[in-house]
């Protein structure tokens, strides 16, 4: 039998350049019509079921080749006779999907060529191509479009590491200056160059937050906390009016930390035996209703500022700690006076970037935020609903008052601020929405918000006990009390996580206490929503010493970052401070990224069940780290004592401040 061939016919007007074909054989020919959309192949008469498709046929172009060599022709061919051999049949077989694939490629190629032709005509001012589907041959030439020069250009720097020289390549001058005084040794840079870059990237992001006036990942020791946070409001229970913090005081960590150990070598969890000297801390004694929890006008405990190269070089400054002896805290039997601050090394500080004018997009965003605030806030005059205003705090972002609610005589904390002076208004909206939507016994009670005469009033319950920070730095907590605090905190976190909210800033500063021992989460400015469509986040926010490794290394993270922070807070309750607080921030970030699970000083003083609780919550791999709900079932939490056991500790702090 003579092999069938393809005979080209008159070009089809289907716009694709595909030609219907006729397979000529001995006997009656069979015509195959290819429709315009090439999605259906319809023979003119019924054809028998084809045998199995031979996938080994050579792939070639559509036409101009024998049928046996082409895979892009029609697959169904009626031979009109049953006498043809199976080998001949296999030679005539093709795959319909190849026709569609070929057609799709032709369509994409044609569309791309038309697009390029149209854009070329547009940019050169010429008319549309007569063959283009985007124009007509009669179109008149268009006027040339003037293209402006780039605006707000940014220089992207690619930093590398040369293992032969042990030096970074392409590193900005600012980063080089910071690295010199960061405390990260040359050997550490060679071992983990990526961790060094991650720490630098976090620093740069923190600087950007500071320049924009937002709440930085490195909370700063300043009089301003532009981000409206629940802690700033409810912290009226632990605020006192003070003068503005001087700019020089912003250069040093505010949380007292012990003398750095002689060796910086890492060790496994609960393995270090370092002993540190301490001094008295009379300056940290609060008044009866005041704690040192940070606000707009009080130096934030735990919160190192975003340091410059000069201030980083002063990291050897000794930090003050309470002088009461405790088996858990790293201290010596004798106390010493703090050493004088060493003169910073002469390092040229990186010049601050020139401030840019606010873009119209930012102005539009502010308008949208203001409209949102008006829709979610009470428009009434709050001065008619609350009385007995007593100013208990002042800062650049607003004033904090204690007051009484008219009718109920309920004691509340109110923060008043001029919304037009807040640089990150969207953070305020975020926090208000979280607080209004989530009510739980372990979350600070949100009462109301007022937007009246361009001023925002946030009303929260009055937490007179202050923050957990004062308790852990001035008292020795038993394992039962630590278990109680962890249990209450985890219950609040579980509620947030079940509702798709990750807190991202769990630490003792953001755990508030009442005089009855109630334990509640606060400060929801860093909260983020995670739903089924977005199960992970990558933004580097939070406070570095409590930050999970996956955040520091800029990986995707989820709810379990809060579990890690809880584990760090548990160490804080044991030792009075989080790990690496005595290190400067850049080195602390490096250690978190490279060491992972931190160590504590006296592991032999902890029970095995507490040790296991710390190990579980501080598991480096987030996939193996338990969730908040799973950690709530840990045996350690069964040792929890009633929260009322914290009342004497809270009251002792207040009475000592009298």
From Swiss-Prot:
Keyword terms, alphabetized: ATP-binding, Cytoplasm, Cytoskeleton, Kinase, Nucleotide-binding, Phosphoprotein, Serine/threonine-protein kinase, Transferase
Places the protein is found: Cytoplasm; Cytoplasm, Cytoskeleton, Spindle
Keyword rRNA-binding: no
GO MF annotation terms: ATP binding; protein serine kinase activity; protein serine/threonine kinase activity
Post-translational modification: Autophosphorylated on serine residues.
Domain of life from the UniProt record: Eukaryota
Keyword Cytoplasm: yes
Region annotation (Disordered) ranges: 1-21, 39-104, 126-147, 213-365
Binding site for ATP: 392-400, 415
Signal peptide segment: none
UniProt catalytic activity: L-seryl-[protein] + ATP = O-phospho-L-seryl-[protein] + ADP + H(+); L-threonyl-[protein] + ATP = O-phospho-L-threonyl-[protein] + ADP + H(+)
SUPFAM superfamilies: Protein kinase-like (PK-like), Wiscott-Aldrich syndrome protein, WASP, C-terminal domain
Subunit organization: Forms an activated complex with GTP-bound ras-like cdc42. Interacts with skb1 and the SH3 domain of skb5 via its amino-terminal regulatory domain. Skb1, cdc42 and shk1 are able to form a ternary complex in vivo. Interacts with rga8 and may interact with byr2.
Protein name: Serine/threonine-protein kinase shk1/pak1
Gene source species: Schizosaccharomyces pombe (strain 972 / ATCC 24843)
Lineage, opening ranks: Eukaryota, Fungi, Dikarya, Ascomycota, Taphrinomycotina
């Amino acid at each position: 039998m003579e092999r069938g061939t393809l005979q080209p016919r008159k070009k089809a007007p289907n716009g694709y350049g595909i030609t219907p074909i006729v397979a000529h054989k001995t006997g009656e020919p069979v015509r195959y019509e290819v429709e315009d959309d090439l999605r259906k192949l319809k023979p003119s008469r019924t054809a028998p079921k084809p045998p199995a498709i031979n996938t080994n046929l050579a792939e070639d172009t559509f036409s101009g080749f024998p049928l046996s060599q082409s895979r892009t022709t029609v697959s169904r061919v009626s031979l009109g006779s049953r006498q043809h051999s199976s080998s001949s049949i296999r030679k005539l077989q093709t795959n319909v999907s190849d026709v569609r694939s070929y057609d799709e490629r032709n369509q994409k190629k044609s569309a791309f060529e038309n697009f390029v032709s149209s854009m070329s005509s547009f940019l050169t001012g010429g008319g549309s191509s007569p063959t283009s589907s985007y124009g007509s041959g009669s179109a008149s030439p268009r006027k040339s479009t003037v293209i402006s020069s780039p605006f707000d250009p940014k220089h992207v720097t690619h930093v590398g590491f040369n293992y032969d020289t042990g030096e970074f390549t392409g590193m900005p001058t600012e980063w080089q200056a910071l690295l010199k005084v960061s405390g990260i040794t040359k050997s550490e840079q060679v071992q983990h160059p990526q961790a060094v870059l991650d720490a630098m990237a976090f620093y740069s992001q923190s600087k950007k937050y500071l320049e924009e006036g937002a709440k930085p990942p490195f909370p700063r020791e300043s009089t301003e906390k532009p981000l409206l946070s629940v802690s700033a409001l409810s912290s009226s229970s632990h605020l006192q009016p003070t003068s503005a913090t001087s700019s020089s005081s912003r250069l040093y960590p505010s949380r007292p930390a012990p003398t750095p150990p002689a060796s910086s070598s890492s060790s496994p969890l609960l393995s270090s035996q370092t002993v540190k000297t301490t001094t008295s801390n009379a300056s940290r004694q609060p008044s009866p209703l005041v704690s040192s929890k940070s606000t707009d006008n009080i130096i934030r405990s735990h919160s190192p500022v975003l340091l410059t190269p000069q201030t980083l070089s002063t990291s050897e400054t000794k930090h003050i700690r309470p002088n009461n002896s405790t088996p858990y805290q790293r201290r010596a039997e004798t106390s010493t006076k703090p050493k004088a601050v060493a003169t910073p090394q002469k390092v040229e500080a990186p010049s601050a970037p020139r401030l840019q004018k606010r873009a119209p997009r930012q102005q539009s965003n502010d308008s949208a935020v203001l409209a949102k605030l008006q829709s979610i806030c009470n428009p009434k005059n709050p001065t008619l609903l609350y009385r007995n205003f007593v100013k208990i705090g002042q800062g650049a972002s607003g004033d904090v008052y204690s007051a009484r609610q008219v009718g109920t005589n309920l004691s509340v904390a109110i923060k008043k601020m001029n919304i037009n002076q807040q640089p990150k208004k969207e953070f305020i909206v975020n926090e208000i929405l979280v607080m209004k939507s989530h009510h739980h016994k372990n979350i600070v009670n949100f009462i109301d918000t007022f937007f009246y005469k361009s001023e925002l009033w946030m009303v929260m319950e009055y937490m007179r006990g202050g923050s957990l920070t004062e308790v852990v730095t001035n008292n020795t907590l038993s394992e039962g009390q630590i278990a109680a605090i962890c249990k209450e905190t985890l219950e609040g976190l579980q509620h947030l996580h079940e509702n798709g909210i990750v807190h991202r800033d769990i630490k003792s500063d953001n755990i508030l206490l009442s005089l009855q021992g109630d334990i509640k989460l606060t400060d929801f400015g860093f909260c983020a929503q995670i739903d089924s469509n977005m199960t992970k986040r990558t933004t580097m926010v939070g406070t570095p010493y409590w930050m999970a490794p996956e955040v520091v290394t800029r990986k995707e993270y989820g709810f379990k970052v809060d579990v890690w922070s809880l584990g760090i807070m548990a160490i804080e309750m044991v030792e009075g401070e989080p790990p690496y607080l005595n290190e400067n921030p850049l080195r602390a970030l490096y250690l978190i990224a490279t060491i992972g699970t931190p160590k504590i000083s006296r592991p032999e003083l902890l029970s095995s069940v507490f040790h296991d609780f710390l190990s579980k919550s501080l598991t480096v791999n987030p996939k193996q780290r338990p969730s908040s709900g799973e950690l709530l079932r840990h045996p350690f939490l069964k040792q929890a004592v009633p929260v009322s056991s914290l009342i004497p500790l809270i009251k002792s702090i207040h009475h000592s401040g009298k």
